[in-house]
């Protein structure tokens, strides 16, 4: 396992919500539109695109490898079935000096959840730390509640403890890291 910060950029790049958001030296997140933009892919030296959606079609470019992860953005979807295989693929691409773009339709829920799983597995980051880092790079991330439950379970599997938990709110089950902002919107 590499140290938690060894693959991170020396300076945190400016967060982007329309283009590609750089998470580590070799991992980016985006939405489906940006993922099909050849100029963005080539200027960021992307060698592998992982499409975590059923609704976004790939535009295949010959110099890029593509992986399809057909998962809908619904709390009942079993994204956790792909935590290890996607994390392993991202790590493999990095070891070959490549760069991975992980995307879903909006770059908010599915791709973010898989990014968090990767950071936990290969950078030994807690779920809270992985979320804090990823949100600093891409402020719009917000995995759905079902993905959070799966990530919390995955953190327990990896480390034998949890750094966050789900809680009840007027908006339904939410991770406790959202308690403060939820309280500001709706008194709990």
From Swiss-Prot:
Domain of life: Eukaryota
Top-level enzyme category: hydrolase
Active site: 104 (phosphocysteine intermediate)
Domain Tyrosine-protein phosphatase: start-end pairs: 19-160
Pfam family, one: DSPc
The protein, known as: Dual specificity protein phosphatase 18
Catalytic activity: O-phospho-L-tyrosyl-[protein] + H2O = L-tyrosyl-[protein] + phosphate; O-phospho-L-seryl-[protein] + H2O = L-seryl-[protein] + phosphate; O-phospho-L-threonyl-[protein] + H2O = L-threonyl-[protein] + phosphate
Hydrolase is among the record's keywords: yes
A GO molecular function held by the record: protein serine/threonine phosphatase activity
Keyword Cell inner membrane among UniProt keywords: no
EC number per UniProt: 3.1.3.16, 3.1.3.48
Species of the source: Mus musculus
Any one biological process term the GO annotation gives: peptidyl-tyrosine dephosphorylation
Protein family (similarity comment): Belongs to the protein-tyrosine phosphatase family. Non-receptor class dual specificity subfamily.
Family matches, as PROSITE patterns: TYR_PHOSPHATASE_1 (PS00383), TYR_PHOSPHATASE_2 (PS50056), TYR_PHOSPHATASE_DUAL (PS50054)
GO cellular component, one term: mitochondrion
Biological role stated in the UniProt entry: Can dephosphorylate single and diphosphorylated synthetic MAPK peptides, with preference for the phosphotyrosine and diphosphorylated forms over phosphothreonine. In vitro, dephosphorylates p-nitrophenyl phosphate (pNPP).
Compartments, as annotated in UniProt: Cytoplasm; Nucleus; Mitochondrion inner membrane
Membrane topology, from the record: Peripheral membrane protein
Name of the gene: Dusp18
Region (Sufficient for mitochondrial localization): 95-141
Alphabetic keyword roster: Cytoplasm, Hydrolase, Membrane, Mitochondrion, Mitochondrion inner membrane, Nucleus, Protein phosphatase
């Amino acid at each position: 396992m590499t140290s938690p910060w060894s693959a991170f950029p020396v300076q945190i790049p400016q967060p982007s919500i329309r283009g590609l958001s750089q998470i580590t030296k070799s991992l980016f997140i985006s939405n489906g539109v940006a993922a099909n933009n050849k100029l963005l892919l080539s200027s960021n030296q992307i060698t592998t695109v992982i499409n975590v959606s059923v609704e976004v079609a790939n535009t295949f470019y010959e110099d890029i490898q593509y992986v399809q992860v057909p998962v809908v953005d619904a709390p009942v979807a079993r994204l956790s079935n792909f935590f290890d295989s996607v994390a392993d693929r991202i790590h493999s691409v990095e070891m070959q000096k490549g760069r991975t773009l992980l995307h879903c339709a909006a770059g908010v829920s599915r791709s973010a959840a898989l990014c968090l799983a990767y950071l936990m597995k290969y950078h030994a980051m807690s779920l809270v730390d992985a979320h804090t880092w990823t949100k600093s790079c891409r402020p719009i991330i917000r995995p759905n509640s079902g993905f959070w439950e799966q990530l919390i379970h995955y953190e327990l599997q990896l480390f034998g403890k949890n750094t966050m938990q789900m809680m009840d709110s007027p908006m339904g089950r939410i991770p406790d890291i959202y308690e403060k902002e939820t309280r500001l919107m709706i008194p709990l």
